[in-house]
C-alpha cells in the first residue's frame, strides 16, 4: 500500500473530502475551516481538539506529498486548501461517488459496520440498499490498485462485521470488548448521528449566511 497516512493526516483529508460534497459552497477550506471541520463533534471518532498550528503542520505536509493543493488569488483574501487525494486531474486514485462516501466516513470515524456506514455516509451518497454498501466495500477490498478496506472480525454483540480503511497501514484485528448491558443497536445509533450531522451542517450554513449578510 503506497498510501500511509497518520491519524491527523487521515482526519484532515477526510474533512476535505466530506466538505467538498456536503458544503460545496464553502469549499475549498481555509485553515480555520479545516480546524473547525477536524474538531467537529458530530461524525468524528475520536473527537479531537486540534490547534491551528497543529492543523497547519498537517496541511503543509500533505501539500508537500501532493495530497492537497493551495488555492489563492481570484478574490480570495486567505489561502484555501482542496484535496488531490482522489479524483484529481493528474492523480492515480480514482473513486466512484459511493466509494468516496465510504472511504471518507472510514477516515473520519474508523472501523464501522455496513449498516453504520450506510447511515453515516448518507449526506455524501444515498445507497439504494445494504447490498450496494456491501458490494462497494467488496470492490474496495479487491481493487487491483488496493486493497483499500479490510473486513474485521465481528465484535461481541454485533450482527455485522466491521470494515476499516487501509490508508494508514495494516489494521490490528482486535475486537473491542462490549458491555452488553449498554449495547446500543448500531443502525439506530447511526441514524441518530446522521440527523445530528445534518443539523450541524444546516447550522453552519446558516451562520455563514448570516455572516455574509452582515458584511
From Swiss-Prot:
InterPro entries hit by this protein: DUF480, WH-like_DNA-bd_sf, WH_DNA-bd_sf
Modified residues (N6-acetyllysine): 80
One Pfam family it belongs to: DUF480
Keywords carried by this UniProt record: Acetylation
HAMAP family reported for this sequence: UPF0502
PANTHER family noted in UniProt: UPF0502 PROTEIN YCEH (PTHR38768:SF1)
Homology family: Belongs to the UPF0502 family.
Protein name per its UniProtKB record: UPF0502 protein YceH
Organism encoding this protein: Escherichia coli O1:K1 / APEC
Amino acid at each position: 500500500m503506497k498510501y500511509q497516512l497518520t491519524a491527523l493526516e487521515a482526519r484532515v483529508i477526510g474533512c476535505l473530502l466530506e466538505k467538498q460534497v456536503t458544503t460545496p459552497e464553502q469549499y475549498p477550506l481555509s485553515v480555520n475551516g479545516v480546524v473547525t471541520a477536524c474538531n467537529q463533534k458530530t461524525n468524528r471518532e475520536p473527537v479531537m481538539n486540534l490547534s491551528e498550528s497543529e492543523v497547519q503542520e498537517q496541511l503543509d505536509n500533505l501539500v508537500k506529498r501532493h495530497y492537497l493543493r493551495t488555492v489563492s488569488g481570484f478574490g480570495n483574501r486567505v489561502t484555501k486548501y482542496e484535496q488531490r487525494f482522489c479524483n484529481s486531474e493528474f492523480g492515480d486514485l480514482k473513486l466512484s461517488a459511493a466509494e468516496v462516501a465510504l472511504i471518507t466516513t472510514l477516515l473520519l470515524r474508523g472501523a464501522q459496520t455496513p449498516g453504520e456506514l450506510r447511515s453515516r455516509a448518507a449526506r455524501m451518497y444515498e445507497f439504494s440498499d445494504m447490498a450496494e454498501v456491501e458490494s462497494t466495500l467488496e470492490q474496495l477490498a479487491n481493487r487491483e490498485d488496493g486493497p483499500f478496506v479490510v473486513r474485521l472480525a465481528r465484535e461481541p454483540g454485533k450482527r455485522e462485521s466491521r470494515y476499516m480503511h487501509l490508508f494508514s497501514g495494516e489494521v490490528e484485528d482486535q475486537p473491542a470488548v462490549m458491555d452488553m448491558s449498554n449495547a446500543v443497536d448500531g443502525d439506530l445509533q447511526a441514524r441518530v448521528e446522521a440527523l445530528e450531522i445534518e443539523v450541524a451542517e444546516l447550522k453552519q450554513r446558516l451562520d455563514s449566511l448570516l455572516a455574509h449578510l452582515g458584511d
